[in-house]
Amino acid sequence: MDYLKALLGMTNEYPFFRKNDLPAEPCREIRLAGTGRRFAVTGDYQEPARNHCAAVCLANAMICLKTDRTVKQEERDRLFRRAYALLGNGPLFTREFRKGTGNALFEAGLPGCRLRPCGSPGEVRSCLEKGSPCAVLVMISSLNWHWVLAVGCREYEDGSFYLRICDGWNARADRWLRWGGPVRIRSVTAIEKKKAAASL
């Protein structure tokens, strides 16, 4: 019944998968560094924010891009405030998300990041292999969408493809989204960090 409610848009419970729900067959897995850390969640920022999953998603992307050190709660709060100041309350379409993201990354000390639209599992896998988190706009009904952050993936021999996500409601990246599954993927935007210049 919960699954049916989710598909009809009567709840915010998206039918994401847990690790023990995934196929048991051998697979190829990619995982960004630092995915075991605590991420920002919408529940951390109730006032004055509403429908702020896009800002939380962007804050979590910035956390991933700062893999060289531990990100404490104060830093998570600061990154969220930056993202929220530029993105505001949702719902946000992909174009609006991308427009605010460049400025937020620059202000967070991550200049030179590039946004790359991804339209296939292969493109997403390639970006994740390079260490780029991917902002994913998903929907379960025409009026019920949500931003999540892909921080890894699994690809099986039968071609099934799962994204490891920070869903914005749980502090750990322990949910999975199946490509072509019941939760529809509307867009994927990889956030590619500027490469350090090679020393001569």
Regions found by a protein language model. Give the residues of each.
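Active-site-adjacent structural segments surrounding the nucleophilic cysteine of cysteine proteases
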Residues: 1-91, 158, 197-199
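Conserved active-site-adjacent core of cysteine acyl-enzyme catalytic domains
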Residues: 15, 26, 77-199
